[in-house]
Regions:
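Hydrophobic single-pass membrane-targeting/anchoring helices
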Residues: 1-40
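A short acidic-to-branched-hydrophobic micro-motif
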Residues: 95-116, 171-177
Length: 195
């Protein structure tokens, strides 16, 4: 492995480890949780795709992001195994937008399911607002007869979290409220208008 490859692998592992820490770090709200988050295991290795392919995948993913992310709000992350591209985004500026988000682009349905399961692994499941099944299928209003993906609602370190897949775009999206909001119903309403 070249020195550049080693550095890229070390950076990738550090970013994934930081992401796992961020998603599982304790907060004061965790003391009140009845069920602690599931423990995480070792991080996934970084893919070894070429720069051109990674760049094309990154651009494709950024074009598919929900509205409300201004220029510079998202940064590209090294993609874990099975993921073509991944970005970490700061606060969405639309009303009741999430405080933070991670969006992933995958190549196939098996990778979509794996990335979805990884995204929800360190959360505590709840029904979505309105007593909507979680996890469960979701549909677009324009195509109510066709499942668009899977939807999941939960808490990550006491913060409302919505995770969903989009089978057409081949994306997994995980959005999270911050300590000051939005509330779960607000975040769910944002998802409903941005998915």
């Amino acid at each position: 492995m070249t020195p550049v490859g080693i550095v890229a692998a070390v950076i990738g592992v550090a970013v994934v480890a930081g992401l796992i820490f961020w998603l599982t770090r304790p907060s004061q709200d965790d003391v009140q949780q009845a069920t602690p988050p599931a423990p995480t295991t070792a991080s996934a290795p970084v893919t070894t795709t070429t720069t051109a392919t990674s760049s094309e995948s990154d651009e494709r993913l950024v074009r598919q992001l929900p509205k409300g992310y201004p220029s510079g709000a998202c940064e590209t992350l090294p993609a874990p195994e099975g993921v073509l591209a991944q970005v970490n985004c700061a606060r969405n500026v639309d009303p009741d937008g999430p405080e933070s988000a991670i969006f992933s682009l995958v190549a196939d349905r098996a990778s979509l399911e794996n990335a979805f399961n990884d995204a929800i692994a360190a959360t505590v499941r709840v029904d979505c607002p309105g007593k909507i099944q979680s996890p469960g299928p979701w549909r677009r209003n324009a195509t109510p007869d066709r499942v668009s993906g899977q939807l999941y609602c939960g808490f990550s370190n006491g913060q409302p979290t919505v995770v969903w897949t989009d089978e057409e775009k081949m994306t997994v999206s995980a959005v999270r409220a911050g300590p000051t909001g939005p509330t779960f119903p607000q975040l769910y309403a944002w998802w409903s208008s941005h998915s």
